[in-house]
């Protein structure tokens, strides 16, 4: 038996209510549970109040990732988007280019969206490796769909620091995050 020699700690997430009382025996088999969300913390506290519980936020640094003023956002858009792109609705997809993240499907859906609203009305920024061996060849799909890599779909494949990523999140209008078979 290892438990008398080493404390058992469960780093845990459970995303929604109702509380999974069927997990009680598993929760009790730990000396401490570290919940990565407030929902998980509340669930564990309900199911096993006798188990030591810590809330360990699974999040980003709120000093870096914070909402900027409208004036700051306008200035950032001027600096980072072409003059003809500053009034577009800008979408942002920040994921690994893996099949389960549906990067190729997103490009097809975005093309249909542009066909409906106008090809000069929106832009998609994809922060990913367009040639990831676990994903689709995004450059090929973009070319196949006839999308413009300067105006419609921008690929950002270089590693960037958190400050620059925070700027990107402030500059865009909508974040897209789709995937299949998570967890």
Question: How would you describe each model-predicted region?
Answer:
Residues 180:
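Aromatic "clamp/platform" in nucleotide-sugar-dependent glycosyltransferases that forms part
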Residues 94-99, 130-131, 159:
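Short donor-sugar binding/catalytic loops of nucleotide-sugar-dependent glycosyltransferases
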Residues 83-101, 107-110, 124-125:
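Conserved donor-binding/catalytic core segment of Leloir-type glycosyltransferases
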Residues 3, 128, 135-163, 167:
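Nucleotide-activated donor-binding/catalytic signature segment of Leloir-type glycosyltransferases, i.e.
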Residues 39, 59:
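Carbohydrate-associated surface elements
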Residues 3, 10, 20-31:
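A conserved, positively charged/aromatic
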Residues 66-83:
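A short helix/loop element that forms part of the nucleotide-sugar donor recognition site in Leloir-type
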């Amino acid at each position: 038996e290892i438990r008398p020699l080493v404390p058992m700690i469960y780093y845990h997430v459970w995303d929604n209510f109702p509380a999974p009382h069927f997990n009680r025996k598993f929760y009790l088999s730990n000396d401490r549970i570290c919940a990565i969300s407030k929902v998980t913390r509340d669930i564990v506290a309900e199911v096993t109040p006798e188990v030591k519980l810590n809330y360990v936020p699974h999040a980003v640094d709120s000093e870096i990732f914070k909402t900027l003023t409208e004036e700051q956002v306008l200035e950032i858009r001027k600096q980072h988007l072409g003059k003809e792109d500053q009034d577009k609705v800008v979408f942002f997809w920040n994921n690994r280019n893996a099949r389960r993240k549906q990067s190729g499907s997103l490009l097809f859906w975005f093309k249909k969206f542009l066909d409906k609203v106008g090809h000069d009305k929106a832009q998609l920024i994809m922060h990913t490796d367009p040639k990831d061996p676990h994903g689709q060849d995004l450059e090929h799909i973009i070319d196949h769909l006839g999308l413009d890599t300067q105006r419609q779909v921008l690929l950002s494949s270089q590693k960037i620091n958190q400050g620059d990523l925070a700027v990107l999140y402030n500059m865009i209008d909508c974040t897209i995050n789709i995937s299949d078979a998570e967890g």
